Amino acid sequence: GEPLVSVVIPNREEKETLQACVESIFEKTAYKNYEIIIVENNSSSEEIFRYYRKLSEDPRVHLIRWKKGFNYSAINNFGVRHAKGDYLLFLNNDVKVIDPDWMSEMLSVCQRKETGAVGVKLIYPDNTIQHAGCVVGMGGIAGNMFVNMPAERTGYLHKASLLQDMSCVTAACMMMKKEVFLEAGGFTEELAVAFNDVDLCLKVRSHGHLIVYDPYVKLYHYESKSRGTEDSEEKVRRFQTEIEYMRCHWLDILKKGDPYYNKNLSLTKWNYSLKPLPGMGKKKG
């Protein structure tokens, strides 16, 4: 069968970005049974509302309004409450579809009994990688692998190009069974900006489901345009709070290391290079 997929896209003020995203879905998606839920967050320009009105004429599009401040987790949870599909597809507004089979490919992996969520390969407009899976502990809490590597390269042990289980993937484009999302309690709303996708994936894994990275789906990602500007001091403080939250809640995996990552490999370099050995680089007296 062809289950309904609910695509959830948060948006604020961005008309061109959103339009490029939505048009790429309409024009390029071979799979037909989907709805798009746009969660409008405090836009004020006449231009964006004109575009919303035009979009709303399409029966596949549902526009809902989140009137509180920016909180990525709360906005997406709100979107899910309006979703009719059994499958959720979280999508950033600055992502563009490349391949017609993207949704059906994600769905075929997500429909497997053991799969909880599916992430994909995201590439920058210059054809380098932005996301090919995440590793817990990378750069502190978690980080994307193979960042800035040319997209056609396969990387260490071909990992950038192999379908595989991982601890987490980014929610810039992530499909999840709705029942799995609800069982995990959705996105953690204390994590307003950072690590909410990592946290959700770890919750899903703790319920016994797998997180799968699917490199056969590639989308362009124009990176974080959907957040308003804010006071940088407040930003830093909030980021620290979110790091603390992750440290407290996921102490065990942060201590033991990501089960899908070799503990002899670096946690500061995303390219699977070896950790320096103790004493390396010291001059002999």
Q: Locations of the language-model features?
A:
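N-proximal low-complexity "stem/linker" segments adjacent to membrane-targeting elements
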Residues: 1-27
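C-terminal, non-catalytic tails of nucleotide-sugar-dependent glycosyltransferases
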Residues: 1-5, 116, 126, 138-165, ...
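Acidic donor-binding segment of Leloir-type glycosyltransferases
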Residues: 26-68
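Active-site acidic Asp-centered loop
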Residues: 41, 91-94, 188
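Glycine-rich, basic loop-to-helix element that forms the pyrophosphate-binding segment
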Residues: 66-83
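Short aromatic/hydrophobic "clamp" motif used to bind/position activated sugar donors
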Residues: 88
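Conserved donor NDP-sugar-binding/catalytic core segment of glycosyltransferases
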Residues: 95-141
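A short, conserved alpha-helix in the catalytic core of glycosyltransferases
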Residues: 102-106, 160-185, 189-220
